Amino acid sequence: MIEFKNVDKVYPGGFKALKDINLTIKDGEFVAIIGRSGAGKSTLIRTINKMHDINAGTLTVDGVDVKSLKGKELRKFRRNIGMIFQSFNLVERISVIKNVMSSFVPDLNPIQSLLGIYPKECKLKALEALEQVDILDKAFERADNLSGGQQHR
């Protein structure tokens, strides 16, 4: 469950993107957030995984106080949240599987990260993810070979 209680988000300079937001999204519920450009839709979504901090109120995800998360706890929390952005940032010249595995970089030690050495479990999870979105057959192709719809997946 995701729960916003009296949430405010004010950007530097004083722009208030969110004001007194109260919203509960229960497990299994599908929700559409619609509104005009600049209404705060993206800001609201980005507070869920703490890409943006809230300034007031409380935000909990499955009982976890998002505002209090830091460091390793925040990284562990984010592993369970998937976000699809309006514009995707694939590295076109590398393989599809390497693009997927790049999501594991925060969990690697500095040497693994620098050299791009991924543990077997990361490779298996990446392959599973590609299978789930029906592009496993594209795993070792360059990302720029994917159609727009495949890139979104």
Model-derived features: positions:
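The feature captures the beta-strand-to-loop junction immediately N-terminal to the Walker
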Residues: 34-36
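Helix-to-loop junction immediately C-terminal to a conserved catalytic motif
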Residues: 49
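Conserved ABC transporter NBD signature motif
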Residues: 56-65, 77
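Conserved ABC ATPase "signature" region
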Residues: 64-65, 108-138
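Short coil-to-helix segment of the ABC ATPase nucleotide-binding domain corresponding to the Q-loop/switch region
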Residues: 93-108
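Conserved ABC ATPase signature
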Residues: 141-150
